[in-house]
Amino acid sequence: MDKKGVLFILVSLIELFSCNPKGAEAWKDGIGISQDSVRYDLVFEEPNQGVLIIKDDVDLGNKLCCLPKGVTLSFEGGVIKNGTLVGDGTKIDSHGPCFDRVRILGTWNVPENSTSMFKDLDYDNSLKDVVALANPQIPNKIVIEEGDYQVSAQQHGDVCIPISSNSVVILKGTIRMVPNDYTHYFIIRLNGRNIQLKGNGTIIGDKHTHTGADGEWGMGIEFVHAHDVSVSGLNIKDCWGDCIHVAFESSDVLIEDCRLDHGRRQGISITSAKNVTVRGCTITNVGGTEPQCAIDIEPYAKYIVDNVLLENVTVGNCIGGFKVLGSTGDAKVGTVSIKNCLIASEKYETLAATLCDTLIVEDNNITQNNGWACVRCRSINYLVMKRNRLQYNNGLFQHVKDWVRPAFGKKRIKLIDIENCGSTKIVQNQKREL
């Protein structure tokens, strides 16, 4: 092949993979976008030493534009508007608004970004464009300023706001779920390592406005394969499922100083995780579909939950209080500690624990308002109860017993230390066939 032939091939390859219409079309095909493309050099001036200067508004005309690799967008008075912008390691230099109704895709290098960088976020799922500027390979700070932001599930199982590794997200505003009829969706999903979601903002689900009747998995915040993560200070309410769901082998999780109200299924579910702390939270008005507990520690089949601490948690007007259950398939619950909590239940047991290796219950106020047991423990290998104050209207004051179930063999409770728990009724070695 002569030099001209080689040169032709090189030029063709550059054209295919660069940000021209053909390259953009290939990019779109890879992620299933149906949108016309525009070449970046037709809407932007040529980069000057890797910098694209935006002095006047750039209208993408509702088309998709791929930026060249590694450029910096320097905003000096103008914004980019109306379309889809695909970054490729793109940096931003700006002290004001940058985008106006622009969908953000691709990869970016923006260590600090905010809703203030977007001129208009008055459209559903606009926050997905804000968090799309984050790069999981570098530390990110994302500020969601005061204001109302709507999110909308587009299909069953949709994630409205995905948060990835190395992100600090400060929520000051209110996120509202648009009513839908889906069985499951996730307003925010934390997936990755080293994530903080904090602030004094609010997340509101569609419990009272949901248009369907099936399902129970409309989650406010979900942890999925999340490690070294925390959620603090937030208000989360009216979720079709759980306000918070900790799942899929997450670890080193902190949920602190949050106010959870009117979860339909649970306040918090912990279904697959290790090293979880829930501290200083207030959980109220949980009810609508079973199990209806403030906190439910209940691993799915073949999953493990271990080393959970519930501390200084206040529960009021919930159908059930705290539930610990390790009886699903080959599920296992390791150690659960409950300390300095104020727990009240309007119907079910205030504290119910079944098939747990170690349960430590110390210095709690436990109240039962409807005739069920204050505390019911079954098949706990190591149980410690100290300095708890229990109150009840009628029925069993405290019920601690063996529970023998053929599927799990003869696991018997071993009472190690129960003291200062007031009037206590203990029934040992009682068998029950199910």
Residue ranges and their predicted role:
Residues 1-5:
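Positively charged n-region of N-terminal signal peptides that target proteins for export
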Residues 6-14:
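Sec-dependent N-terminal signal peptides
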Residues 13-25:
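Bacterial Sec-dependent signal peptides at the C-terminal "C-region" and cleavage site
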Residues 26-55, 116-145, 150:
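Acidic Gly/Asp/Thr-rich repetitive segments characteristic of extracellular carbohydrate-active
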Residues 53, 59, 66, 74, ...:
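Extracellular beta-strand solenoid repeats
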Residues 59-71, 81-96, 128-137, 150-170, ...:
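Extracellular beta-strand-rich solenoid/capping regions of secreted or surface-exposed proteins
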Residues 62-63, 82-86, 139, 153-154, ...:
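Short glycine/acidic-rich loop motifs that flank beta-strands on beta-rich extracellular proteins
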Residues 116, 171-174, 193-204, 227-238, ...:
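Right-handed parallel beta-helix
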